[in-house]
Curated annotation (Swiss-Prot):
One of its GO terms (biological process) is proton motive force-driven plasma membrane ATP synthesis. It is found in: Cell inner membrane. Keywords: ATP synthesis, Cell inner membrane, Cell membrane, CF(1), Hydrogen ion transport, Ion transport, Membrane, Transport. F-type ATPases have 2 components, CF(1) - the catalytic core - and CF(0) - the membrane proton channel. CF(1) has five subunits: alpha(3), beta(3), gamma(1), delta(1), epsilon(1). CF(0) has three main subunits: a, b and c. It is a peripheral membrane protein. It comes from Desulforapulum autotrophicum (strain ATCC 43914 / DSM 3382 / VKM B-1955 / HRM2). Produces ATP from ADP in the presence of a proton gradient across the membrane. The gamma chain is believed to be important in regulating ATPase activity and the flow of protons through the CF(0) complex. Pfam families: ATP-synt. This is ATP synthase gamma chain. Belongs to the ATPase gamma chain family. Its main location: membrane. GO terms for molecular function: ATP binding; proton-transporting ATP synthase activity, rotational mechanism. SUPFAM superfamilies: ATP synthase (F1-ATPase), gamma subunit.
């Protein structure tokens, strides 16, 4: 059985750990609030842009942009993998990496796969698997970033697609549903899916708005306008994915630190019980010695 001093030291150590996890939970909560507000502010713009794009797509032809044209035999694929730079966020990074790994093995087995990595965890995994990393952006997910990160990385991939250096581009990120639910998803960025998909509004209210927009005349033409808007749409999707992944990371880190803090409390309660039992056993043994000595004197 451990001595009283040993148990006291363990209790002190766990209390210090609880202070750290509690502080980390508070930081994660603050960051979650900030990233969620940023995501919510961006959502109306992205939604309206999608509505306008959908209305123009209904008038444009399939040859309006080379970004719409799929390759006959795609061989070169780039996967944008969004992960965090740090751990201590539950299964957040593991789930994203597992999603990317399963997607590659099931859909891209016979293709030349390269990576654009947002975050150290994804980059380290790609290196460990001897994958080719074309580009990497660290300190983005979970940190401070703006739209320029998405436009810079997106423009590089668009240029490579137009130069036939890459045939397809996929985006792996964490979709933020709510505080209790975040799901890793895979989305195709290039070539851009069919125009018919753009015409379908996501919400019932957007249908009337799209019909209203369809009455407008596009100058110089729908094809020309669509050609200008499609690259911007790529940037918006990347930026939205980064916002959702950052929010998901902070939500999972907050939950992980909350669970760790609760685990510390439970451990302290257990150690305190052990401490009390050990002290009680020591007192009982001392009393037995005193009683035994008194009887011996009598």
């Amino acid at each position: 059985m451990a001595t009283l001093k040993e148990v006291q030291l363990k209790i002190g150590s766990v209390k210090k750990t609880r202070q750290i996890t509690s502080a980390m939970k508070m930081v994660a909560t603050s960051r979650l609030r900030g990233s969620q507000e940023k995501m919510d502010r961006f959502k109306p713009y992205a939604s309206k842009f999608s509505e306008v794009l959908g209305s123009i797509a209904g008038k444009a032809g399939e040859e309006a942009s080379p970004l719409l044209v799929p390759r006959e035999e795609p061989k070169k694929v780039n996967v944008i993998l969004c992960t965090s730079d740090r751990g201590l966020c539950g299964g957040f990074n593991v789930n994203l990496i597992d999603k990317a790994d399963k997607f590659i093995k099931s859909k891209l087995q016979d293709k030349e796969v390269t990576f654009t990595c947002f975050g150290k965890k994804g980059r380290d995994w790609a290196k460990k698997m001897s994958m080719t990393i074309d580009d990497q952006y660290l300190g983005v997910v979970g940190g401070k970033f703006d739209f320029s990160v998405a436009s810079t990385s997106g423009q590089k991939l668009i240029n490579r697609f137009l130069e036939a250096d890459v045939d397809e581009v996929y985006l792996v990120y964490s979709e933020f549903k709510n505080l209790a639910r975040q799901e890793p998803v895979v989305k195709q960025l290039l070539p851009i899916p069919s125009l018919e998909a753009m015409e379908k509004p996501d919400e019932a209210g957007a249908k009337e708005e799209t019909a209203y927009l369809a009455e407008h005349i596009c100058e110089p033409s729908s094809d020309a306008l669509l050609g200008e808007m499609l690259p911007k749409n790529i940037f918006i999707q990347i930026y939205d994915a980064l916002l959702q992944t950052s929010t998901s990371e902070n939500a999972q880190r907050m939950k992980a630190m909350e669970n760790a803090t609760k685990a510390c409390k439970d451990m302290i309660d257990e150690l305190q019980t052990i401490f009390n039992k050990t002290r009680q056993a020591g007192i009982t043994a001392d009393l037995m010695d005193i009683v035994g000595g008194a009887e011996a004197l009598n």
